Regions:
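Cysteine-dependent hydrolase recognition
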Residues: 1-181
């Protein structure tokens, strides 16, 4: 129902943008999450970043990138509305570029590329979320596209990735507005 063997839309998730604090009870769904890393030290650092962000209300920048990769840039159409909806909540920049570099204030980074360069030049704040909208970002090893682990290794606290072909349907990837709020 929520997966397709071919590139076709699937049933919408009732949990998307829902106010429920109890999805297992309300929707019979259990959101899947994992602590990912290639070593105990990486996972511990990830946990420590999460703890450091608790109740800190970090004042960072949200970067929403509109890229030249047409297959992975479908969220860009929602960026203007996201900026309007979250005005006064987060400092947000919509940039027409494939990647950012040399920024030390990254709280959110949404882009659409199979590989994101220059991650080593970025400073992710504790609690930062980063995502690159690919078919296989959730394949932690042996992927033909960048693994979501690269974000975590660069200092992000959270990322997202699929392990089966989602066919670039926007509902299969985090909505920046929902993820940030």
């Amino acid at each position: 129902k929520y997966c397709s063997k071919k590139c076709a839309p699937t049933a919408p998730s009732p949990y998307f943008n829902a106010p429920s604090q109890y999805p297992a009870t309300d929707y019979k769904l259990r959101p899947a999450m994992m602590l990912a890393g290639t070593s105990f030290e990486q996972v511990k650092a990830l946990i420590d970043r999460g703890i450091a962000s608790d109740h800190s209300f970090p004042k960072g920048q949200a970067y929403l990138l509109s890229t030249s990769d047409k297959a992975r840039n479908n969220r860009a159409t929602s960026y203007a509305q996201t900026a309007k909806d979250l005005a006064g909540v987060f400092s947000l920049q919509i940039l027409e570029t494939n990647f950012i570099s040399d920024r030390q204030d990254v709280l959110f980074y949404f882009t659409g590329l199979t590989e994101v360069p220059m991650l080593e030049t970025l400073g992710f704040l504790p609690g930062a979320l980063a995502d690159h909208l690919t078919s296989a970002g959730g394949m932690l090893t042996d992927s033909l596209q960048m693994s979501s682990l690269r974000w975590l290794e660069a200092g992000a606290t959270a990322s997202y990735g699929t392990v089966t072909e989602p066919c670039s349907f926007p509902q299969k990837f985090p909505s920046p507005a929902v993820a940030m709020f």
